[in-house]
Amino acid sequence: MSKSLLTWSLLIFLGLTTSTTSCAQKRTKQEQTTTVQKQRTESPEAMLKRFYTEYIRSFDRMYEPAQMDSLILANATPEAKAKLERVRALTDSDPFIRAQDLASGSEGSLQVRALGQDWYQVSFGSGEGYRAIPLHLQKSGDKYLIDFITPEWHHSEYGDKLRSNPFAATKSVDMTSPINFIRSFYECYISHYLAMKPELEVELKALRDRYCTKATIQQYYDSLASVGEVESGFFDTLIDNVDFDPSWCSSLSVRPSSASGVFEVSYSDGEGERHKWLVRAVPQADGSYRLDRQPS
């Protein structure tokens, strides 16, 4: 074999050896990285145990509002946080614990149980202070976040029906008649509450501005400023409430009242209370309507 050929053979051998070694090193490094990532990912049960332990202790430690917000946003989606603030305004209790306050040391009885389909039950306390709260988690990157907590009026229920949107199919407002307009407007409006999107307030305002009279829009802001829930920043005169639950949708009713051209809108909430108010569909020059809520 010539010296030149021997040299080329040696170079090829060294190149293949180097390439194989490099690939092996890359695979080893990738495997190590994956192992570290897996080690960093908390199990759902561990995440809930950690979060609820700190949350319960925060009452004794008297966290500032900013500290509570930071703790919640590190462990729940922004949409869930906004939803839970509305539920808090509705029930006058903290939806994370279904109470206004907790006895010191309650975290000692804390238990977390898997229910299936990303649902878990968090329980703590004893006797009259016992709480068992179902909630749902979603995976976000390498961690889990709370994206729904069962409201207390549903007690121990869990499942996708609690997060459903029965009005999701109503995509537009029907202008074919006054009653169709009112019904479809409310289905669209309520659907935005149920969808729990980040831009909820913007979308609700857009619907009010487009489909309500100026007097109704002003009534919305006046009610917000005069009703007790204003302390927590929530009250919507168009639904006579601070939020809407999927289980209330089947009770939504729109029917003519005794007054000409006036319709009664009503529904029953989780406590069995019947909410009622009167509206008109005001004809516009272009053939459309505007919703006019009648003063109480």
What residue ranges belong to the model's regions?
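Surface-exposed, charged secondary-structure patches
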Residues: 75-131, 213, 217-271
